[in-house]
Design a protein with these regions (language model features):
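Short amphipathic alpha-helical segments
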Residues: 17-49, 90-98
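Glycine-rich beta-strand-turn "strand-cap" elements at beta-sheet edges
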Residues: 1-4, 40-65, 94-125
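Internal catalytic or translocation cores that form aromatic/hydrophobic pockets or channels
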Residues: 68
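Active-site-flanking beta-strand signature of metal-NTP-handling nucleotidyl enzymes
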Residues: 5-12, 71-72
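Short amphipathic alpha-helices within nucleic acid-binding modules
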Residues: 19-22, 77-88
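Short strand-loop junctions, especially beta-strand C-caps/beta-turns
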Residues: 10-16, 79
Length: 125
């Protein structure tokens, strides 16, 4: 039986190279609508750190902001659909364009939903 899952691919790049990462992520996002099993996606870029939500001391927060962090979040109706997308030649080529600018990652964590807000006409209620 298929199980819906969410994948979050995380990576960091040097300041000044974020435009290259954004272009690669736009290319990846462009492949998703035609992918079997794709349900949803979003691309996130860091802009700061929360002193309230972070356990890092001041110097740790500053060090962590030395790079630009990205999250490529995808939602799939099955692990098989996810794996088919990520093993494709097109995705691997796009990932290859990132290697020269990465400071960490990419790595992906897979999730299944534990708590979700109820939906009504595609809006949380």
């Amino acid at each position: 039986m298929s199980q819906r899952l969410i994948g979050q691919t995380m990576f960091s790049v040097r300041h000044g190279t974020e435009h290259r990462a954004e272009r690669a992520l736009q290319d990846l996002a462009g492949l998703l609508p035609a992918s079997a099993g794709h349900m949803n996606h979003r691309v996130l870029r860091s802009f700061g750190m929360s002193p309230l939500g972070s356990a890092l001391r001041d110097e740790g927060r500053e060090a962590a902001l030395g790079d630009v962090h990205f999250v490529f979040e995808t939602e799939w109706d099955s692990l098989e659909a996810h794996d088919e997308f990520y093993s494709s030649q097109s995705v691997q080529q796009i990932y290859g364009t990132l290697h020269s600018i990465l400071t960490s990652g990419p790595f992906e964590v897979l999730y299944d939903a534990v708590v979700e807000e109820p939906q009504h006409d595609n809006a949380a209620v």
